[in-house]
């Protein structure tokens, strides 16, 4: 079971990194970040496929999408100086709460 969560963590991290590279790629106009987008998403989906061998789909996908969304928002704030308003923050709190509750069940 621990291996499944390690695979899931790698899937989340690589998906968020790929999303950041997608922004940097400037619509795939810059080839270096574009290559990293493909590698990042490829790794994310491969790790997710390994995760699904151990952790049920409902738990895996909810965690992957929720944690990935939160991590991507954090990257947006830290690297791209994006601003979060109160609704954004409330949404992130809801996502984190949902991911925690799903994993506790």
Swiss-Prot record:
It is found in: Cell membrane. Pfam families: Multi_Drug_Res (PF00893). It is a multi-pass membrane protein. Its main location: membrane. InterPro entries: Small_drug/metabolite_transptr, Small_multidrug_res. One of its GO terms (cellular component) is plasma membrane. GO terms for molecular function: transmembrane transporter activity. The chain crosses the membrane at residues 2-22, 35-55, 60-80, 87-104. The keyword Cell membrane applies. Keywords: Cell membrane, Membrane, Transmembrane, Transmembrane helix, Transport. Gene3D superfamilies: 1.10.3730.20. PANTHER family: MULTIDRUG TRANSPORTER EMRE (PTHR30561:SF1), SMR FAMILY PROTON-DEPENDENT DRUG EFFLUX TRANSPORTER SUGE (PTHR30561). Belongs to the drug/metabolite transporter (DMT) superfamily. Small multidrug resistance (SMR) (TC 2.A.7.1) family. EbrA/EbrB subfamily. The efflux pump is composed of EbrA and EbrB. Part of a multidrug efflux pump. Confers resistance to cationic lipophilic dyes such as ethidium bromide, acriflavine, pyronine Y and safranin O. The efflux is probably coupled to an influx of protons. This is Multidrug resistance protein EbrA.
């Amino acid at each position: 079971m621990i291996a499944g969560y390690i695979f899931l963590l790698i899937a989340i991290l690589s998906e968020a990194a790929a999303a950041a590279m997608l922004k940097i790629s400037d619509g795939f106009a810059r080839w270096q970040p574009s290559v990293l987008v493909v590698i990042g998403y490829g790794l994310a989906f491969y790790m997710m496929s390994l995760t699904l061998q151990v952790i049920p789909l409902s738990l895996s996908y909810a965690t992957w999408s929720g944690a990935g969304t939160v991590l991507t928002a954090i990257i947006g704030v830290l690297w791209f100086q994006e601003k979060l308003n109160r609704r954004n923050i409330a949404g992130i709190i809801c996502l984190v709460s949902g991911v925690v509750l799903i994993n506790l069940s």
